[in-house]
Amino acid sequence: LTVRRSVALSRAVYENEAEVEDLKGVLVKDAAEADRILQRGEIPVLVDPEADIIGSFHPDVVVDAILAKKNLGTRITDAPFVIGVGPGFYAGKDCHCVIETKRGHTLGNVIWEKEAIPNTGVPGNIGGFTTERLIRASADGIMEPVAEIGDTVEKGQLVARTGKQPVYAKMSGIVRGMLQKDVQVTEGL
């Protein structure tokens, strides 16, 4: 699932292709197809939860940017250079370096020893708002967005339906992320 879809090549999983600035991602099924896409100067996007392609593709660099807040299986031996993004990775153990993702003056720092700042479970404070900034599923079911990324919304405005239940904005502002239509969600996601 991708929330910030306008800046993520992962949306190619649902759209077959995705562009972010001057980069184009193309959905592929295997290593051979990935190699063809790379030869065209484009980025292959592959659904591979176990990262099995690493064994046959032998990449020079692996970047785990799943943002799961924990390491789901990335190993420092996966490639000559392995990067973990966000909490859950320990530089020198799980990967060669970690990129800090916590909002603030350390955002984007490269960590060569130790780990990223642990996940607090609370979004960064912007203008006095933390959890209110999130749009969460009100019920299990299919996601039906009403608002789109970039829309200005008011507090209390209907922004989506999940499992046919309404989801309302908890604050006024601009929608910066929204799951795509027709994905299965669970309450609270």
Residue ranges with predicted function:
Residues L1-L189:
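Well-ordered secondary-structure scaffolds
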